[in-house]
Swiss-Prot record:
This is Sperm protamine P1. The keyword Cytoplasm does not apply. It comes from Hypsiprymnodon moschatus. InterPro entries: Protamine_P1. Signal peptide: none annotated. The keyword DNA damage does not apply. Protamines substitute for histones in the chromatin of sperm during the haploid phase of spermatogenesis. They compact sperm DNA into a highly condensed, stable and inactive complex. It is found in: Nucleus; Chromosome. Belongs to the protamine P1 family. One of its GO terms (cellular component) is nucleus. GO terms for molecular function: DNA binding. GO terms for biological process: chromosome condensation; sperm DNA condensation. Residues 1-64 are annotated as: Disordered.
């Protein structure tokens, strides 16, 4: 029983590590966007955000 529990926790940790890596990358990009938002105009920012959102969705489809 102990061996089964250990193997299960090992697989779960591997899954969590992969998720954390992606989330950290996304957080860094969000901070970059926030710093850039102040410089851009209101209309330009909206167009930029829309383009980023589309690209992210496309990449996600490619991932899975």
């Amino acid at each position: 029983m102990a061996r089964y529990r250990h193997s299960r926790s090992r697989s779960r940790s591997r899954y969590r590590r992969r998720r954390r890596r992606r989330s950290r990358y996304r957080g860094r990009r969000r901070r970059y966007r926030r710093s850039r938002r102040r410089r851009r105009s209101r209309r330009g920012r909206r167009g930029y955000y829309r383009r980023r959102r589309y690209s992210r969705r496309r990449r996600r489809r490619y991932y899975y």
